[in-house]
Each structure stands twice: as C-alpha cells, then as structure tokens.
Amino acid sequence: MTERERKFEEMLNDILTQYAEVSEKMELLKAEGKNKTVAFKQLLASKLTLQNILIMYKNHGLIDSF
C-alpha cells in the first residue's frame, strides 16, 4: 500500500467514525425531544456534509456502501 493509499484509508475511517458518532448524538437528542435545537441542527449539517463526502466516494467506486 502506498503512502497516499494509507492516508486515504485513514481519512475514510475518520469520516466513517465521525458519521457514526454524529448519527448517535442526533438519535440521543431526538429521543430527548430536542430535535429542534441549534445543537441538533448543527449535527444535522455535519451529518449531511459527511454523507455527501461518502456519496462521492461511493459514486467514484472507492467504497461500496456506508
């Protein structure tokens, strides 16, 4: 594996981890009825950004799914 490939894999793992963490935090806020708070909306924006990155990876054949 080249250095570039290793860095890509690290970045992909970071994005997947962040996506899972943001999703979990959103679920907790939603369960508490706090889905209209600024914190929830900020998490939603982060989740959508991460999701768009993952979709680009998928569209270019770099990952199968997330």
Q: What are these model-predicted stretches?
A:
Residues 1-66:
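Extended, charge-rich alpha-helical interface modules
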